[in-house]
From Swiss-Prot:
Its main location: secreted. It is found in: Secreted; Secreted, Cell wall. Belongs to the fungal hydrophobin family. Residues 1-19 form the signal peptide. Disruption phenotype: Disruption of all 7 hydrophobins leads to altered germination kinetics, decreased survival under exposure to extreme cold stress and increased mycotoxins patulin and citrinin production. It holds the Pfam family Hydrophobin. Disulfide bonds join 36-90, 42-84, 43-76, 91-105. Keywords: Cell wall, Disulfide bond, Secreted, Signal. GO terms for molecular function: structural constituent of cell wall. It comes from the Eukaryota. This is Class I hydrophobin G. Aerial growth, conidiation, and dispersal of filamentous fungi in the environment rely upon a capability of their secreting small amphipathic proteins called hydrophobins (HPBs) with low sequence identity. Class I can self-assemble into an outermost layer of rodlet bundles on aerial cell surfaces, conferring cellular hydrophobicity that supports fungal growth, development and dispersal; whereas Class II form highly ordered films at water-air interfaces through intermolecular interactions but contribute nothing to the rodlet structure. GO terms for cellular component: extracellular region; fungal-type cell wall.
């Protein structure tokens, strides 16, 4: 009987530890450009994958917004420090429609 009670407490303890918040991968992506799918980008806007304006476009392209990790960059072009008012973005999933839509984006530090 003691063995089964100890087993239950061990499982509960392991479950509690695994439920603690972990460091986000987003912070690693922001400083590591090796995961970018192309050049650094200058995006007019960064939005969430579940944005009601972007969601129909994603659906039309056959992309499930729930599977996107990071932000969505809109109206992106190659980053040039002299002509970009924002921080450069690293997009790790896709750059679609000539930069109109970039997936998995995050600002670089």
């Amino acid at each position: 009987m003691r063995l089964s009670i100890l087993s239950v407490f061990s499982l509960v303890g392991a479950g509690m530890v695994s439920a603690l918040p972990q460091e986000s991968n987003l912070s690693m992506k922001r400083s590591d450009t090796s995961e970018c799918v192309g050049p650094l980008l200058c995006c007019g806007t960064l939005t969430t994958p579940l944005d009601p304006v972007v969601d129909p476009l994603l659906l039309a392209l056959g992309i499930d917004a729930a599977n996107i990790v990071g932000s969505i960059g809109l109206l992106c072009h190659g980053y040039e420090e002299s002509s970009c008012p924002t921080k450069p973005q690293c997009c790790t999933e896709a750059n679609l429609l000539g930069g109109t839509l970039a997936l998995g984006c995050a600002d670089l530090k």
